């Protein structure tokens, strides 16, 4: 295609590729969604696999709470991927319409419909509770002694023996084999979402030139933001939540890390739970076996190997003696010790499961909304079409509206920067990056509160990109602001020419109040007073800060956010 619709470089991103990325992301969203639904289908096979006792009940409660929150975080991540898928199609359509407007003699452009995606968190079915395993508590111990003792008698003696000490408090024990199987069921979920995350990043790489530093950095930010990072994120609950993590290699993906690690650790804790159940079962069986051995020795049943009938007749007469002998030889101290070890391990595991909640809660706050990722994808796609050229090319219809003195396309401005190299050899003056979409579009009230918490500043956001562009356009259309902007731009051109240009220069624009709500804000004062109980306040205006671009000879919106006059 001809300039300005393409530029020099090793990768020439075309609208067709944006449609392909959009379609691929939609498929990956479905795969990410199915990874959890398939796991939950398997989980339904494991009802009533738990045991009795207060400690097993506590573990089951903690496990259920963690799984429920994991499902919530996973569902929000599904929605975020869908938003990204839609954003790439929107930009491809905007490009087609802009190209058609530039070349009216060409055949009319027909926009493609956005991909069918999940745009709100799915309602996943809760897995069945652990419950208490069905069956008689003593069934696991009826075969502890191969002495040919009749079933009813054996049951009577075993039950009486288990009543010594605390054994019956924890019976029936969990089905350790099924609990171990459930632990293994978590691992395919962890592997599956890992593969999908890799596919998703490969998809974005299709429209990324990693040899272009600004492009590469933007790609890393786009991918990491999909997994919950922000410009203000810090190291919280043991994870990096910033776009540019200060430690560790590569890109931070905290929400993905939480989902993956939680699955891995739940698998580990369930395996340890199963091992603890097996260990106490084995210990109690050994104690009973020893008691029966000693009881038979005391009773001198030397003819124990005779026929079943003779044995039955004889043991029947000795019921009271056998019971008394077993009870006499049961080691109550060892029984209680085995129970104590088991319950101590369960309490340890319960606390470990509870400890997973902090990262999950943070992840639930951090997952971006559908609206946020749609806007970010539009921005990344817009800039990729022109290889992150600093000469900005607006694409949306608003930028071509003759009623707008200054056309506006926030997506095409995102990541714009204006470093300046003075002609006299002074050091390079660092540019000011545009970040309206990344920091001020589609944030939830909880995300605004998290920003206040992390940065100690007021925080605000537009609900979506359309509202942001409407509010900013209103400010740009204000007649006084038009005069202010034109005067300011003329001065910037002169300063570029004489080498005195400062990238941070910005005109002081009038704040324009609209009838409609532009967004919401949470003040530091309110957060300091109420914490996460602070409520967002609706706003009807926006603060707009511009920056001048020497490369394009015009301005870009460095940032804009809802703010009361």
Predicted regions, residues:
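Extracytoplasmic/periplasm-facing segments of secreted or lipoprotein envelope proteins
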Residues: 410-453
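Functional cores of ribonucleases/endoribonucleases
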Residues: 445-565
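Extracytoplasmic/secreted envelope proteins and their assembly/folding machinery
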Residues: 22, 183, 197, 216, ...
């Amino acid at each position: 295609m001809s300039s300005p619709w393409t530029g020099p470089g090793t990768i020439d991103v075309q609208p067709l590729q944006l449609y392909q990325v959009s379609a691929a992301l939609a498929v990956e969203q479905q795969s990410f969604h199915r990874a959890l639904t398939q796991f939950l289908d398997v989980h339904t096979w494991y009802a009533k696999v738990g045991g009795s006792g207060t400690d097993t009940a506590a573990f089951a409660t903690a496990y259920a709470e963690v799984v429920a929150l994991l499902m919530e975080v996973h569902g929000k991540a599904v929605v975020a991927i869908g938003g990204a898928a839609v954003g790439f199609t929107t930009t491809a359509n905007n490009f087609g319409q802009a190209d058609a407007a530039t070349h009216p003699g060409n055949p009319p452009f027909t926009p493609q419909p956005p991909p069918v995606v999940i745009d709100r968190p799915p309602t996943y079915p809760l897995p069945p509770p652990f419950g208490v395993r069905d069956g008689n508590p003593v069934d696991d111990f009826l075969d502890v002694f191969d002495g040919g003792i009749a079933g009813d008698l054996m049951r009577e003696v075993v039950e009486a023996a288990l009543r010594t000490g605390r054994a019956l408090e924890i019976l029936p024990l969990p089905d350790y084999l099924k609990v171990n199987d459930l632990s293994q069921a978590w691992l395919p979920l962890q592997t599956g979402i890992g593969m999908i995350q890799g596919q998703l990043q490969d998809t974005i790489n299709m429209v990324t030139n990693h040899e272009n530093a600004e492009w590469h950095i933007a790609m890393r930010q786009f991918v990491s933001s999909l997994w919950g990072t922000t410009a203000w994120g810090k190291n919280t609950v043991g994870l990096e939540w910033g776009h540019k993590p200060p430690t560790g290699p590569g890109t931070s993906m905290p929400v993905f890390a939480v989902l993956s690690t939680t699955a891995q650790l739940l698998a580990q804790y369930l395996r340890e739970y199963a091992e603890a159940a097996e260990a106490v079962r084995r210990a109690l069986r050994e104690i009973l076996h020893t008691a029966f051995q000693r009881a038979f020795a005391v009773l001198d049943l030397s003819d124990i190997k005779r026929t079943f009938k003779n044995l039955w007749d004889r043991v029947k007469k000795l019921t009271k003696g056998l019971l008394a002998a077993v009870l006499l030889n049961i080691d109550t101290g060892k029984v209680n010790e085995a129970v104590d070890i088991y319950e101590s391990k369960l309490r340890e595991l319960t606390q470990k499961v509870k400890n997973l909640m902090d990262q999950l809660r943070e992840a639930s706050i951090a997952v971006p909304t559908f609206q946020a990722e749609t806007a970010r994808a539009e921005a990344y796609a817009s800039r990729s079409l022109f290889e992150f050229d600093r000469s900005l090319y607006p694409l949306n219809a608003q930028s071509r509206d003759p009623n707008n003195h200054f056309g506006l396309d926030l997506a095409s401005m995102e990541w714009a920067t204006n470093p300046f190299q003075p002609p006299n050899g002074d050091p390079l003056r660092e540019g000011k990056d545009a970040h309206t979409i990344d920091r001020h579009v589609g944030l939830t009230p909880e995300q605004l509160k998290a920003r206040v918490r992390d940065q100690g500043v007021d925080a605000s956001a537009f609900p979506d990109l359309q509202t942001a562009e409407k509010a900013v356009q209103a400010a740009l259309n204000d007649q006084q602001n038009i005069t202010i902007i034109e005067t300011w731009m003329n001065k910037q051109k002169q300063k570029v020419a004489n080498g005195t240009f400062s990238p941070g220069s910005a005109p002081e624009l009038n704040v324009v109040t609209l009838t409609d709500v532009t967004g919401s804000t949470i003040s530091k004062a309110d957060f300091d007073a109420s914490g996460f109980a602070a409520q967002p306040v609706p706003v009807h205006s926006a603060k707009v800060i511009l920056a001048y671009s020497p490369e394009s000879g015009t301005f870009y919106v460095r940032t804009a956010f809802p703010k009361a006059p």
